[in-house]
Amino acid sequence: MRRRRLTTLAAAAALASLAGCGFQLRRPQPLPFARIALQGFEARSPLAEALRRALRDVAQVVAQPQQAQVVLVAMEDLTQRSIVASTATGQVREIQLRIQFGFRVSTPEGTPLAAPAQLVLARDMSYSETAALAKELEEAQQLREMRADIVGQVLRRLASVRPAGG
C-alpha cells in the first residue's frame, strides 16, 4: 500500500514538473479554414487516407468542392521502388523508396490560393533475400513514415493558405 502511494506521488510530481516547465503534447496545426475537399487522388490512395485522418482533427473534409472553402487537388501521387545496388550475382542489396506528391490549393471556383507544390521524399534501405519477410515489413513501415512526413508538410503549407474572404 505504501509503495503504491509513493508511486502515485512520484508520478504526480513528475507531471507537475512537466506542466510547470511549459511542456505540452504536440497539437494539430490550426488551419485558417473550416472545410476542405480533396480531389485528384486515385481510389484508395494511402496518402489520401493519411491526409483525411490528419485533417479530421483540424477541419471538416467534404466530398463536394462546392461545400468547401479550400480544395486540395492532387496532381501527382506516385510511390516508386527501385533497385539501387546489387551484387555481382544479381542479388538485390539496396533499394530506394520514393514518394512524389504534387498538389495545388484553390478555391472551389478554381482560383489558386498558393503556388503548386511538389514534395519528393526518397529513402534508401538495405535488402536481403534471406530476410525477405522482415524487409517487406520494414519497407511498409518506411512508406508509412514517409507518408506521415508528407502529410505533415502538406498541413504546414495549408496553415499558411488564406481562403478568399477570410
Specify the residue positions occupied by each region the protein language model found.
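Bacterial Sec signal peptide processing site at the extreme N-terminus
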Residues: 15-35
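Surface-exposed short loop/turn segments
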Residues: 73-118, 125-140, 156
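C-terminal/domain-edge helix-coil "capping" segments
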Residues: 133-166
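N-terminal segment of the mature soluble domain
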Residues: 31-78
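N-terminal export leaders
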Residues: 2-10
